[in-house]
Design a protein with these regions (language model features):
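Active-site/substrate-binding loop(s) of hydrolase catalytic cores
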Residues: 3-32, 40-173
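Conserved phosphate/anionic-ligand binding catalytic regions in large, soluble enzymes, centered on
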Residues: 36
Length: 173
């Protein structure tokens, strides 16, 4: 932690984002969890990831800075957790139509203002996004992973990008 700012500045010099000599660089990885508060395993997964990094994979941390954002949407998560605690069945009801799986509006997916933060990256209208983008741009990580859940009947696949890339995507990215 003592060298964190030095590492960050070195990384920005290597990327060409700020002036300075290019030198040895560590990989910067940013992990975002729980942008949809009702994707409930996400924040717990962030804690497991942090634990595993410091107990099982410490060698990775010699060459990598890992930034963990454990809960991008704390308002939505809090709303979902309160809903679930009030409505869960004991024993748990796995029927998709049971009340514990049917949140009322304004559900945990959105922030306090009923805004889906996962739709705010381009427009940056929400305070949470503004602050996160500022910090993200302070680091410009090599890798960003945005963790989500998916429904059992709605899998999805995002193919890797192909050329030509958009003009605002730099060679460094």
């Amino acid at each position: 932690l003592d060298n964190l700012e030095k590492i960050r500045l070195s990384h920005l010099q290597n990327s060409g984002s700020i002036k300075g000599p290019k030198n040895e660089n560590k990989s910067i990885v940013w992990l975002s969890y729980n942008i949809h508060g009702n994707e409930s395993s996400s924040s717990e997964a962030s804690m497991k990831t942090a634990y595993d990094l410091i107990t099982k994979h410490t060698k990775w941390l010699l060459d990598t800075i890992v930034i963990i954002d454990p809960c991008v949407n704390p308002d939505g998560r809090d709303r979902y957790v309160n809903f679930y605690k009030q409505n869960r069945g004991i024993p748990y009801d796995t029927n998709q139509n049971s009340i514990e799986h049917d949140e009322p509006w304004h559900n945990g997916r959105t922030n306090h203002y009923a805004f889906d933060l996962n739709r705010d990256w381009a427009w940056v209208t929400q305070t949470e996004t503004k602050n996160r983008i500022n910090k993200f741009n302070d680091w410009l990580p090599h890798i960003h992973v945005d963790f989500h859940e998916q429904g059992i009947n709605s899998p999805y696949y995002f193919a890797p990008a192909v050329e030509p890339y958009h003009e605002v995507v730099s060679k460094f990215q």
